[in-house]
From Swiss-Prot:
Gene this protein is translated from: hisC
Catalysed reaction, written as an equation: L-histidinol phosphate + 2-oxoglutarate = 3-(imidazol-4-yl)-2-oxopropyl phosphate + L-glutamate
EC numbers on record: 2.6.1.9
Entry keywords, A to Z: Amino-acid biosynthesis, Aminotransferase, Histidine biosynthesis, Pyridoxal phosphate, Transferase
Cofactor(s) the protein requires to work: pyridoxal 5'-phosphate
Protein source organism: Campylobacter curvus (strain 525.92)
Record's protein name: Histidinol-phosphate aminotransferase
CDD domains xrefs: AAT_like
A GO biological-process term: L-histidine biosynthetic process
Pathway, per record: Amino-acid biosynthesis; L-histidine biosynthesis; L-histidine from 5-phospho-alpha-D-ribose 1-diphosphate: step 7/9
Enzyme class of the recorded protein, top EC level: transferase
Length: 365
């Protein structure tokens, strides 16, 4: 059987290992496993949201309101934008897929950082687009502009991951806005701001204001409920852009693309600001501990504006350390698939991080 030729060079996205795998393979009880691989919220889900999901569970047989009116109203009020400027996705990565299907094709190219979220390339290759990456692993806007100017006739989509996953660095907001002014209005610029809450809390100069994006005709801001809001398992993301962009992307959206329970969870999550603040405060405090640990252990790391930190290694094998940690019930994210001798650690609660430090010390040479 012949398949779409664009699939030939594609590899599956490597997700963080689940707790169930560790239980099966190593016989460790689930309660003793610490998962710090997928940048989930270490406090879980807001208790208010859990109760809302329970209350709505009896309606699981019903399709959701496909207009997502209540959620869009809540997002619009929070960010100061209109409901027609918002699209809802099954995770923000679904909206990434919409963007590429809407703008990219085999005659066009997509521009991204040297090391960044893997799904940009996967979705781009699905539509047969060419990939351009910067020489630097981290975001360097001078390099972005250099490549853009050299291939203006090809590039149809540009991705900026702010802050960047899996490295953690983040550009200053002012330089991002200046960059956007240099890009032709027929090129769609996707600002993937899944970790924006963490960046903004740490340094206001790094936080993108989604309402500011509406000043640009060709830019879309992507946000998610998976990180700061603790709804990774609910799969809810959103995009904010000019109505002209949103209306085109909506043509690609299947009806009922998030569930009845996911919709209820997202609406309630926006109300619990105390839970989000608790999450951000813990992240900032515990991030400082990881940075101090890395300095003391002479581990290379990139200052992070996310809810994770990436440790890079020279002589030791990051994959070997990750595997050893896995056998002890601690799941980290080996970045071998990104061609890095590094692993990424989600910032956990204090007691979780204590165990990470203890086990890491046993593996460092």
């Amino acid at each position: 059987m012949k398949f779409n030729e664009n699939l030939a060079g594609l590899v599956n996205y490597e997700a963080g290992k689940p707790i169930e795998l560790v239980v099966r393979e190593f016989g460790i009880e689930a309660k003793d496993v610490i998962k710090l691989a997928s940048n989930e919220n270490p406090f879980g889900t807001s208790p208010h949201v859990v109760e809302a999901i329970k209350s709505a569970a009896s309606n699981a047989f019903l399709y959701p309101d496909d207009s997502y009116f209540e959620l869009k109203e809540a997002l619009g009020a929070k960010f100061g934008v209109g409901t027609k400027n918002i699209i809802i996705g099954s995770g923000s990565d679904q909206i990434i897929e919409f963007c590429l299907h809407a703008k990219a094709n085999p005659q066009s190219a997509v521009l991204m950082a040297g090391v960044t979220f893997a799904m940009y390339e996967i979705y781009a290759k699905q539509v047969g687009a060419k990939i351009y990456r910067t020489r630097s692993q981290e975001h360097d806007l001078a390099e972005f502009l250099e490549i853009y100017e050299a291939h203006k006739d090809e590039i149809s989509v540009i991705f900026l991951c702010l802050p960047n996953n899996p490295l953690g660095e983040c550009l200053d907001t002012k330089e991002v806005y200046e960059f956007l002014k240099r890009i032709d209005e027929d090129v769609l610029v996707v600002l993937d701001c899944a970790y924006n809450e963490f960046a903004k809390f740490k340094d206001a100069r790094k936080g993108i204001e989604s309402s500011e994006i509406l000043k640009f005709k060709n830019v879309i801001y992507l946000g998610t409920f998976s990180k700061a809001y603790g709804l990774g398992g609910m799969r809810v993301g959103y995009g904010i852009a000019k109505e002209s962009i949103i209306s085109e992307l909506c043509k690609l959206r299947a009806p009922f693309n998030i569930t009845t329970l996911s919709l209820k969870a997202a609406i309630e999550a926006l109300k619990d600001e105390e839970f989000v603040t608790k999450t951000l405060e813990n992240n900032l405090k515990q991030m400082a501990r990881y940075e101090a640990f890395a300095r003391e252990a002479d581990i290379e790391f990139i200052p992070s504006y996310t809810n994770f930190i990436t440790f890079k290694f020279d002589k030791q094998s990051a994959s070997e350390i990750s595997q050893n940690m896995l056998k002890k019930g601690i799941i980290l994210r080996d970045l071998k698939s990104y061609k890095l001798n590094a692993f990424r650690i989600t910032i956990g609660q204090s007691w979780q991080n204590d165990r990470v430090f203890e086990e890491l010390k046993q593996n460092l040479k």
